[in-house]
Amino acid sequence: MSESALPRKNNAYNRFLLLVAGLGGLLYGVDVGIIAGALPYLEATSGLNAGQLSIVVAAVLLGSVISTLFAGMLADWMGRRLVMTLSGILFVTSIPTIALAHGYEPLVLGRVLQGISAGLIGVVVPLYLAECLTPDSRGKGTAIFQWLLTLGIVAAALVGIYFSFRVDEVTKLGDPAKVLAFKDTAWRSIFWVSLPPGVLFVIGTVMVAESPRWLFRRGRTEAARAALLRSRAVAQADAELGEMAAETAKRSTGERVKESLLRRKYVIPFVLACIILACTQAVGINSIIAYNTTILLQSGLSDVQAHWGYVFFTIVNFLMTFAGVMLVDRKGRKFLLSIGTTGLFISLLAVGILFSRAESRRVDSSRAMQAMVGAGQKLSLVYDHKTADTLLTAAGKAGQAAADQATSLIVIYSYGDFRAATPVARSDDAMAKPVEINRESCVPANKVVAFFSNPFGNLEAARQAPLKIENALITPVPGAGNGWLVAISLLVYA
């Protein structure tokens, strides 16, 4: 029965189901995309080193991997609707955990919660749609989930650029303390803004019915029929109940598929599909999204320009997802896969060449910086044009960068067996905090963290070891033209 032939109340409920599923996709997209806009401000104000920041970024993927492994099991045990509600609650909980965080551990915890939420949503919402929607609406439900997932990434980028404009306005006032305070407010606010969709998703999941197939498998036939009647006419609901009963009868009589799934014609396509899926992740799509703004900043764009580049990237990603769904049946999977793979190769090659060209003028001034280390085995450095010129001169590279050209500095240092890196500092950022190098930001506070940092490291020795500057890399910041070339290359990637 077509959707138009259903009673009005059934059509309204089906639209509500699609809305709730769409909110699930939107949350998934926000989970993936929100960190890119917040990361530059988090890096500038949190005092975390580069390794800690990378873990904050990657924690959402860790949570997603963990929850994806158990999502199906939880959905069978607790029910589809309850797991969706749980995923929404986890997302809502993660926002204040992150936005109110004053330290490394709460940030990681909040990001892990976001990842767990995303993993549950990514598995359970499509499963729920497949079991609840009428056959002629299932394709629409899957498409809406995927479109709103990419739209969630766009929304996260738009939130980021709004706060980028605000930061730019405060920067023009010329007060470093106010700029630092507002950057701290900015990254927290970016996460707060993503809270309302999570609340709406939780409310929506409470209002929908449980999956009729899950209810039927639990022996709750009348509840399953009631759930079906919310989205179907009586005749169609009874017909689907009959199909469920027939499937159950087949299983109870011990009827099995006679052909082995381990035959060559099944195994090879399965292995190839797994390899292709693994390769789509190995090309770094999640990292490109999470670090998009940071990549564009390092390629030569200003803060506002970098956020615009991220907005363009997410919009192209959204449009290409729409185009892919429209063309997949017309042009075929192989054609789209070939086009996409070619685009990825060209994009990554172009970005690599552009960064390689910029970094060919990189200078290591580690010896000069090591000489600055005092008796306390720590170092605080205001990195500006004068400091850059001093370090370059000491490294025998005087004049490597023009007097008015911005340079970036990243310091890799160690205490004993433990290493860390400073966030990237720029000589043209008069509002930036000093580069701080100390034992607390490198040596783990306890043995548990030390094990994950370096399983073979000697923690007690590191607490007494002197500071060693391993690399102090000064790189001329490319111009905006180079930055826009990188942005265009990333659009091809999208």
Predicted feature descriptions by range:
Residues M1-A494:
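Transmembrane-helix signature of 12-pass secondary carriers
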